[in-house]
């Protein structure tokens, strides 16, 4: 089994966090280092280290992450103008916490997906 992460403690409310949504499958909270006016992390309540570790048993939680993202975008007033959902996987993908999570970013034009530094 994977090691517990800081996100596990947020789910259990053992450490302070600005939780904007929580149910039996997912938790969503504001990022402590926001990269946009709205920057919320949406995580499954079960520890799944990376996207590579996802299996069929996780489909309900992963689907809920998407529907919760849309609901939060509406509540935050960014749904109409648009927003970005990002999941990073492993070191080259930029993953820093090994508990899969989806970034919901919006509130301003976000620019290109990747910095153009060549292939």
UniProtKB/Swiss-Prot annotation:
PROSITE patterns: HIT_1, HIT_2. Gene3D superfamilies: HIT-like. GMP binds at residues 30-32, 88, 96-97, 101-103. Its EC number is 3.9.1.-. Residues 6-115 form the HIT domain. Keywords: Hydrolase, Nucleotide-binding. A motif (Histidine triad motif) lies at residues 99-105. GO terms for biological process: D-alanine catabolic process. It holds the Pfam family HIT. Signal peptide: none annotated. Belongs to the HINT family. Hydrolyzes purine nucleotide phosphoramidates, including adenosine 5'monophosphoramidate (AMP-NH2), adenosine 5'monophosphomorpholidate (AMP-morpholidate), guanosine 5'monophosphomorpholidate (GMP-morpholidate) and tryptamine 5'guanosine monophosphate (TpGd). Hydrolyzes lysyl-AMP (AMP-N-epsilon-(N-alpha-acetyl lysine methyl ester)) generated by lysine--tRNA ligase, and lysyl-GMP (GMP-N-epsilon-(N-alpha-acetyl lysine methyl ester)). Is essential for the activity of the enzyme D-alanine dehydrogenase (DadA) and is required for E.coli to grow on D-alanine as a sole carbon source. Homodimer. This is Purine nucleoside phosphoramidase. It comes from Escherichia coli (strain K12). The gene is hinT.
